[in-house]
Amino acid sequence: MSLWDAIVIGAGPAGIGASGLLAENGAKVLVIDEAPGPGGQIWRGVEDVSDARARILGSDYLAGRDEVRRLRASGAELSFETQAWRVEPEGTVWLKDSHGIRRERGRRLLIATGAMERPCPLDGWTLPGVTTVGGLQILLKREGMLPGGPLVLIGTGPLFYLFAAQCLAAGMRDLSLIDTAAAGAIVSALRHVPAALTGKGPSYLIKGLKLLWMLRRAGVDIYNHSGDLRIKSAADGLEVHFRMREVEHRLSASHVGLHEGVIPETHLPRALGCRMHWSEAGGAFHPHRDIHLQSSVAGVYIAGDAGGIGGATVALLEGRLAAMGILASLGRPIDELLLRATRRDRAAHLAARPLLDHLYQPSPAILTPADGVLACRCEEVTCGEIRAALRAGCAGPNQVKAFLRCGMGPCQGRMCGMTLTSLAASTHDISMGDAGFLTIRPPLRPISLGEVADLVEP
């Protein structure tokens, strides 16, 4: 077991920004990521992307190339295709890679695991041909491929519209969008417009308007404020049934992509016992962080979307802020001018975030699905079974887990955890924060007893 000044978990924008700066300032840094290379989800495969594919994915994607090169040149130790399956508050990280199990120790830990797509259980979401928009985008980034049309995208959020525009750039024309954003979202978002017009906010708004203009110009059908969604099997693929303005609609599809925005990936912070709070605007639990981005657990820092959704640029800046906080805590000198400038840049890039959070709030119907909808895919538990357990006396997600095994499968509650919280809140008429969340215990990823037994300490 080696001792590092810092272990960075995640090699997306936040992990890249942090580990590069740490290593450049003489810190001994280990960076781990489950992917084959750096970049995270947003910059996946950017090192070897073709020019043709880069044009499809856009300038924001290609901006990651220079950051990845800086990481490679920084001197940080990079360990890819590596899973962190157990993390301990004092800095011990249990890792699994192609060589087996090993332990590493960090004087400081930085969690930069990014975001995950908000699970959106609805009738038919487990059918063949139904996947997430994020999954389809990974296919485009890694292989330059898209499924054959017609393709129907269901959901809302910036990534929802970005991927639709990328589909157009890749040559797909048989495309329809069903926007599920809450009907009153625009009204609730209006009060945040003035703040969004400050700092870097206008650049984000212009980018979004350009995406919508591209889709409208191409004649893509967009069905706004839709509900009562159902996906059914059909002889030639899939059928999507929904209601818009009290009118029933039906679309044929070969594939369906689901997306209800992204939320922080908080399994590691929760496993470490970091204090969490419910963000009403973000619609998710966020870890508490101080001005240095340190969590409530001493020595554990959280940067990027894992601490709150802000996008790639904010994640990169937060990685650098966390790195400076770590350096200062280790007694290393930091550039105070750079620190202040980075904080200003971060605030400028977050100016439009409240507007976006309110504009793309998911519909309540998505958060509390019908009884017949499968909530836990791993253990095949329906929303009706969860409601019955809650009415029978289960206080919240953890008691439901004990009775029905929700959250005990391979995904460890990543797919059903938010639904459990939503159903507990609605059934008991309490807030999401009071309903709470699943307690996370190691192993965080599936691992065999044989692999643990084969652990050999150097």
UniProtKB/Swiss-Prot annotation:
This is Opine oxidase subunit A. It comes from Rhizobium meliloti (strain 1021) (Ensifer meliloti). Keywords: Oxidoreductase, Plasmid. It comes from the Bacteria. InterPro entries: BFD-like_2Fe2S-bd_dom_sf (IPR041854), FAD/NAD-bd_sf (IPR036188), FAD/NAD-binding_dom (IPR023753), Metab_Enz_Cyan_OpOx_G3PDH (IPR051691), Opine_Oxase_asu/HCN_bsu (IPR017224), SoxA_A3 (IPR041117). Pathway: Opine metabolism; octopine degradation. The lineage of its organism: Bacteria, Pseudomonadati, Pseudomonadota, Alphaproteobacteria, Hyphomicrobiales. Heterodimer of a subunit A and a subunit B. It is an enzyme of class 1 (oxidoreductase).
